[in-house]
Design a protein with these regions (language model features):
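Acidic/histidine-rich, surface-exposed loop or edge segments in extracytoplasmic proteins
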Residues: 27-37, 50-59, 102-103
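Secreted/periplasmic proteins
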Residues: 33, 46-49, 99, 105-112, ...
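Sec-dependent bacterial lipoprotein signal peptides
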Residues: 1-15
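Surface-exposed patches in mature extracellular/periplasmic domains of secreted proteins
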Residues: 57-71, 84-94, 129-145
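Bacterial Sec signal peptide processing site at the extreme N-terminus
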Residues: 11-37
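N-terminal secretory signal peptides
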Residues: 39-75, 79
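Disulfide-stabilized extracellular recognition modules
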Residues: 115-165
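Short, surface-exposed glycine/acidic/tryptophan-bearing loops
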Residues: 70-115
C-alpha cells in the first residue's frame, strides 16, 4: 500500500512538472494561400522566388521586387476588378514604357485563387510563359484584387521589366 502511495505521489509530481507541449499546426505555404478572400495579399517575395527558380532552371537571371512595378501591378489589378474583366497587356506595357522601364511585359489574368494556380497556368500558356522567361527582365511587381461578386473572384497582375532607362 505504501509503495502504491509513493508511486502515485511521484507520478503526480512528475505530471505537475511536465510542460504542455503544443502541437504546431503546419502552416500552409503562402503560394497555396487563397486570394479569394477579403484582405488577402499575394506574397510578392514568394512569387519572385518561385518565378526566379523557374527562370534559373531555364538559364535566366533573378528578379528583384521593384516598388514602382509593384504599385503599377496593384493599380492594374484594381482596374481589372473595377471593370470585371482582364485588361490587355499592351496598354500596361505602354504605361510601363512611359514610366521609363525598358522591355516591359505583363501577365494579366483572372480566376486563379492561389499563387500556385496562377504560376502553373502561366507556365502552361505559351504567351504567359514568354513573360516569365523574358530574358531582359530584371524587375518584378505582382498584385491581386479580390472581387466577391465577380465571376472570376480574383484578378492578377504580374509585370516585369528591365532596369529603368
Amino acid at each position: 500500500m505504501i509503495r502504491l502511495a509513493i508511486f502515485s505521489l511521484c507520478t503526480l509530481a512528475l505530471a505537475a512538472c511536465q510542460t504542455e507541449q503544443r502541437q504546431a499546426r503546419p502552416q500552409t505555404p503562402s503560394f497555396y494561400a487563397s486570394m479569394a478572400q477579403s484582405g488577402a495579399v499575394v506574397d510578392a517575395a514568394m512569387a519572385r522566388d518561385m518565378i526566379g527558380a523557374y527562370r534559373r532552371n531555364n538559364g535566366l537571371g533573378p528578379l528583384t521586387i521593384d516598388p514602382d512595378l509593384q504599385a503599377l501591378a496593384e493599380a492594374e489589378a484594381q482596374a481589372m476588378a473595377s471593370t470585371d474583366r482582364p485588361s490587355s497587356a499592351d496598354a500596361v506595357k505602354s504605361r510601363l514604357s512611359s514610366a521609363g522601364f525598358a522591355a516591359p511585359a505583363a501577365n494579366l489574368s483572372a480566376g486563379y485563387h492561389t499563387l500556385a494556380e496562377a504560376f502553373s497556368g502561366w507556365r502552361e500558356s505559351p504567351q504567359h510563359n514568354r513573360v516569365l522567361l523574358d530574358r531582359s527582365a530584371t524587375r518584378i511587381g505582382i498584385a491581386t484584387v479580390y472581387t466577391p461578386n465577380s465571376k472570376y473572384k480574383v484578378y492578377w497582375a504580374l509585370v516585369v521589366a528591365a532596369d529603368k532607362r
